[in-house]
């Protein structure tokens, strides 16, 4: 199967000679190039019964690497199950108009933080309004910066429980079909973002801001989940997704990459796109986040502070389990991912492989 690593191995050096990369972009390229190769060391499993020997090299664990997200995703899903309430959940997505792309990309850390701030305030302020819910809610928000064709398209996915705590400490359920009116969410988000953008970046072109204010911003809310059990599994699709997965890469020949993408504007049809390797690398690296940037955040009673004071009450009021859920071991998570015991020989079925560590080659 064609991988991003193959494209980087063939073209990244030439690309770096003609393009200026940030430190994080350089680190990401190097990590993906070395992922699951002898450069990072690994281990050797030997079956004492039949002698079958298999070598596995270590992953780079870079959060932008298409090969390194599965175990991290399963660990995250497992840890989040303890936070589930026995209510429905809504999926709300906030997007910015493309006219702001240049401003956002040239000030990524500040602008991504501003997006999170405005999204969380918009949801929590409207939820607390008696006209809508009249209760304090919580949410988990995840930043994505890409569109299906690897374009720059910053947006935030939110998973929000269908209700909240009122001032009397009682649980209030939201309406079944929608959490909050989409138009109200869109306009409040637009007003907050543009007002704070003016304060943070006073040199921003005023005509650009006026044009953005006169547009309807896209916010959409998907129908509620029927059960809480599938919420974190669903959210896991978004939390550890990277700009493009290897299974969407179709062909790499004569310096051209062909990949498939879903066109949401054309009835979600799958299409194919052909671009040069240099353009593919440029698009991929646009989505490397600033160093240490937190792309998954929790607010309200799902924040660190909220968990200590209010989450247990919410679980009690909604009939959710109050018992702490036992976290799965790495072995059990691997069994879930692989569908087999990693300590069982794939040749003869014997359980109890002998493992030997393999050090990276000397520099």
What are the functions of these language-model segments?
Residues 1-363:
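Beta->alpha loop/short-helix hinge microenvironment recognizer with preference
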């Amino acid at each position: 199967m064609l991988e991003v690593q193959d494209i980087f191995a063939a073209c990244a050096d030439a690309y770096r000679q003609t393009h200026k990369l940030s430190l994080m972009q350089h680190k990401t390229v190097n990590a993906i190039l070395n992922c699951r190769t002898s450069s990072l060391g690994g281990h050797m499993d030997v079956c004492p019964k039949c002698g079958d020997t298999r070598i596995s090299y270590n992953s780079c664990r870079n959060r932008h690497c298409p090969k390194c997200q599965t175990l991290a995703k399963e660990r995250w899903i497992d840890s989040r199950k303890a936070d589930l309430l026995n209510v429905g959940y809504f999926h709300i997505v906030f997007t910015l108009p493309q006219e702001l792309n240049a401003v956002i990309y040239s000030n990524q850390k500040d602008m991504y933080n501003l997006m999170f701030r405005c999204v969380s305030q918009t949801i929590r302020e409207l939820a607390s309004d008696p006209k809508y819910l009249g209760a304090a809610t919580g949410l988990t928000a995840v930043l994505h910066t890409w569109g299906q064709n690897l374009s720059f398209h910053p947006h935030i996915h939110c998973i929000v429980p269908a209700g909240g705590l009122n001032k009397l400490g009682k649980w209030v359920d939201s309406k079944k079909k929608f959490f909050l009116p989409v138009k109200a969410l869109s306009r409040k988000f637009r007003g907050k973002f543009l007002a704070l953008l003016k304060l943070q970046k006073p040199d921003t072109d005023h005509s650009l801001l006026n044009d953005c204010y006169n547009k309807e911003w896209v916010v959409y809310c998907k129908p509620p989940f029927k059960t809480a059990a599938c919420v974190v599994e669903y959210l896991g699709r978004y939390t550890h997704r990277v700009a493009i997965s290897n299974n969407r890469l179709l062909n790499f020949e004569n310096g051209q990459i062909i990949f498939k993408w879903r066109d949401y504007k054309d009835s979600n049809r799958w299409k194919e796109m052909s671009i040069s390797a240099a353009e593919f690398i440029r698009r991929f690296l646009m989505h490397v986040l600033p160093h240490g940037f937190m792309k998954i955040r929790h607010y309200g009673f799902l924040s660190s502070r909220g968990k200590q004071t209010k989450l247990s009450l919410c679980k009690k009021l909604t009939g959710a389990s109050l018992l702490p859920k036992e976290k799965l071991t790495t072995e059990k998570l691997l069994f879930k991912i692989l569908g087999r015991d990693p300590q069982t020989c794939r040749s003869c079925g014997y359980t109890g492989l002998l493992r030997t560590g393999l050090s990276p080659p000397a520099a």
